[in-house]
Amino acid sequence: MKSLIPFLLTLFLASSFWLEGKVEDTKRPSVLLINVDDWNDWNSVLKGHSQAITPNIERFAKKGVTFSNAICASPSCVPSRPALFTGIAPSRSGNISNDSGKRPWRFYAGPVTITIPKLFSQNGWASIGIAKNFHRGDVPEFDTYIPPFKTPKKLKKVGLNLNSSAIWDIADMPVSEMGDYKAASAAIKTIDSHEGPLLLSVGIYRPHVPWIVPQAYFDMYPPETLKLSERRVKDLDDLPERLKLVAGLEAKFGKGYHEKLVRKGYDKQFVRAYLASVTFADEQVGRIL
């Protein structure tokens, strides 16, 4: 089940790596944290899919430490992100599903819990958040917060899910208009201009659905050569009952969703769109690095 669980890709870099030419505070090195949304092990490092094109993650992995057995605290955004930033497990906080998002994450974490950005701020770092970090409620935690950039809705409307809403599509626009591209650009500008110890936390939204990226990323994965992962029969049977419920509610496995995709011939299109989004995300990570 590891390959089905999205994770937050966390990249830490000391200031000596990415603040070249600037005076370092050796006691307080700058830290870069990149959160990539819903990216499983489909990359050229963990090799969850043999055709994933992710040269930037691969380049970074060769310079650092790869935690190949790391799993996020929860397979849903609302509980997973606060768990990362507070160190409090969902099983302890009670923030266990996306339905928990009806209340702010602080309700579950408690009023006195100190988050990672607050801890840095209290100890001499400037903390800057860009785009999606906490899944709502970012503003009070960072000294400076830049909200997610919206992508203009210029779509070719070619990929619909079974409810006729866009779950994948081709963005009919330059890559520079994509929200994640703008977030990466804001991160680059911050790195280039900031002086002194810095915690910079950047959120990259793709490959979260909808898988909408420009045509060039789809072209990297020709449908006729695309491989589908082997489907494991009764793959959910060994899960605890609670996780079976999560799978049914969140991933729609309990509703025969995958069977419908296969029957309608959409499975390869979905794999292609996800991989295209993965490569797009990898490119934004590479620009920041």
What are these regions (language model features)?
Residues 83-176, 215:
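Catalytic-site neighborhoods of secreted/periplasmic enzymes
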Residues 6-16:
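Bacterial N-terminal signal peptides
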Residues 27-31, 63-68, 123-127, 195-200:
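Loop/turn elements at helix/coil->beta-strand transitions in domains of secreted/extracellular proteins
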